[in-house]
A protein has these predicted regions:
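Pre-Walker A-like glycine/lysine-rich segment at the N-terminus of P-loop NTPase domains
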Residues: 1-46
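Phosphate-coordinating catalytic segments in nucleotide- and nucleic-acid-processing enzymes
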Residues: 1-10, 45, 49-249, 320-377
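Phosphate-binding P-loop
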Residues: 18-25, 185, 239-243, 273-276
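Conserved H-loop
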Residues: 248, 279-289
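Walker B catalytic acidic pair
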Residues: 251-253
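Conserved hydrophobic alpha-helix in the ABC-type ATPase nucleotide-binding domain
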Residues: 264-269
Length: 377
């Protein structure tokens, strides 16, 4: 189990709750207000896993870790260079590396016999832009993480066979390779992705690319040689044996989607995480619907452990493939002060007292106060 401890980096001041910091689980969810550091944590996790994988695959030798430039390049890659402070601390305990960054100095311990890292996919919040930018390779001012995701999306389209089920009623996506055009099919209508609703523009790249990466069996991305070295290495890392698992980092799966569709997307992501025991899913969210959907998935896992026959009726509520064990998830909440805390559980389920439910509760409270004003004489 990988762990990440962070202090004084961007909006993040410290990680409370445990001495090890944030401990990854099969499913890790980050919740909190806008600008509290959810994406920062997600990017740091992905960056550290990328460095670990690059070392394990021989793309980075031990002497490459002698300076902090390697980690600082990751800050640049994710546009977090300005986040570093004089007292920044980053400590990552992985399978084959222990990275410790303090006062601008990087120390690394190399472990022996660790399990090779999994494939990595980072799905950025800006993913809806991919439908608007076909000539993305010429757009060097875009974030590198977004450019890499666009490259992954292009690769996924090449391997697309038939229509892509978007998990929504009577809706699918179809790719026309001849004119490099993605279409959204809804009932009898056919719409170009770039002209479709914003929810489709966010959902289609996410679902197609995650399915491709999660099922990738050693396929190389031919376009990677045209990218600069950082991107080329990223491509090679993702062309690995799928038996080593799949690490999926997703920003805001709920983006531009109706609540019911948000739940469907999370169930899809959970199902992909359950394809292999080594797979992991890490997501950021502002949505109470996703947290509630995760709670349902955990409860389903609890029931299936003791009552196997419950699955016949459970499929009416959620896909059985989305059910997870109660010790296979963790929810971490970030506050406006930059403190990260693990959300406690109640009988294995996420505690109701969290930021997202508090926001919903305040709405109900304010509505009640307005009703009281209305009833005053």
């Amino acid at each position: 189990m990988a762990c990440l401890n962070v202090a004084n980096f961007g909006p993040i001041k410290r990680i409370a709750s445990t001495r090890k910091g944030l401990e990854e689980r099969k499913v890790t969810m980050l919740i909190g207000p806008q600008g509290s550091g959810k994406s920062t944590l997600l990017k740091l996790l992905c960056a550290c896993h990328w460095l670990e994988k690059a070392y394990a695959k021989g793309l980075l030798a031990q002497n490459a870790f002698q300076t902090a430039d390697l980690l600082k390049h990751q800050f640049d890659y994710y546009r977090m260079a300005s986040y570093e402070q004089e007292d920044t601390v980053i400590d990552f305990q992985g399978e084959v590396l222990h990275l410790s960054y303090r006062h601008g100095k990087l120390d690394v311990d190399f472990k022996q016999g660790g399990q090779p890292p999994a494939k990595l996919l980072y799905v950025p919040s800006e993913r809806s832009l991919v439908s608007l930018m076909k000539d993305y390779k010429a757009m060097r001012k875009l974030p590198e993480s977004l450019l890499d995701f666009m490259g992954d999306y292009d690769s996924a389209k090449k391997y697309m066979v038939g229509d892509l089920n978007l998990g929504l009623p009577a809706t699918s996506a179809r790719y026309d390779a001849g004119c490099d055009q993605m279409w959204i099919l809804h009932s009898k209508n056919k719409t170009r992705l770039e002209e479709a609703a914003s929810g489709y523009q966010s959902l289609t790249p996410l679902k197609l690319t995650v399915e491709w990466a999660g099922n990738l069996q050693g396929k190389e991305d031919g376009d990677s040689l045209e990218e600069r070295m950082a991107r080329m290495k990223q491509r090679k890392l993702n062309a690995t044996d799928a038996s080593f698992g799949f690490l999926n980092f997703v920003e805001e799966p709920e983006q531009n989607l109706y609540p019911d569709a948000q739940v469907r997307v999370l169930n899809f992501l959970l199902s992909m995480a359950n394809l292999r025991s080594q797979n992991k899913l890490m997501v950021t969210t502002h949505s109470p619907y996703l947290l509630n959907a995760l709670t349902l998935a955990v409860k389903a896992g609890q029931i299936l452990q003791v009552k196997k026959t419950a699955g016949k009726n459970m499929v009416r509520i959620l896909p059985l493939k989305a059910a997870i064990l109660d010790d296979d998830y963790a929810v971490w909440q970030l506050d406006e002060k930059g403190v990260v805390r693990k959300l406690e559980d109640f009988h294995g389920l996420p505690l109701d007292e969290n930021f997202l439910n508090t926001a919903m509760g305040k709405f109900n409270s304010d509505f009640g106060k307005l009703q009281e004003l209305e009833d005053e004489n």
